[in-house]
């Protein structure tokens, strides 16, 4: 699963997801893409699940690009813990996705295959998505 090798700080603020994606919203590498339509967090597990579906579906014919990277650590406290005693330990990593962000791009396959592969991948995503063709 994806995670950064090192970060400047161990813990980050959760932040707010405002506005549309200004970067990473164009089809850059492939011919077909999966684009988010709403803001949200994609965990490294969800990104990996989508990658597995796409690689199995397109076999060796297509090439896949993952356009997002989980670089934000999400901390959690143990259950039944009183308030105070600092912020919790990092539990998992997420990628912040805004509306318009391209999540996956593929090339080297026909449009019907790409469309059905992206549809299956979209079921694994926590945000609404759409299929984009060049």
Swiss-Prot record:
Keyword Cell inner membrane annotated: no
Keywords, in A-Z order: Chloroplast, Plastid, Ribonucleoprotein, Ribosomal protein
A single cellular component GO annotation: mitochondrial large ribosomal subunit
Pfam family, one: Ribosomal_L16
Family: Belongs to the universal ribosomal protein uL16 family.
Assembly notes: Part of the 50S ribosomal subunit.
PANTHER family: 50S/60S RIBOSOMAL PROTEIN L16, LARGE RIBOSOMAL SUBUNIT PROTEIN UL16M
Protein name: Large ribosomal subunit protein uL16c
Species assigned in the record: Oltmannsiellopsis viridis
Lineage per the UniProt record: Eukaryota, Viridiplantae, Chlorophyta, Ulvophyceae, Oltmannsiellopsidales
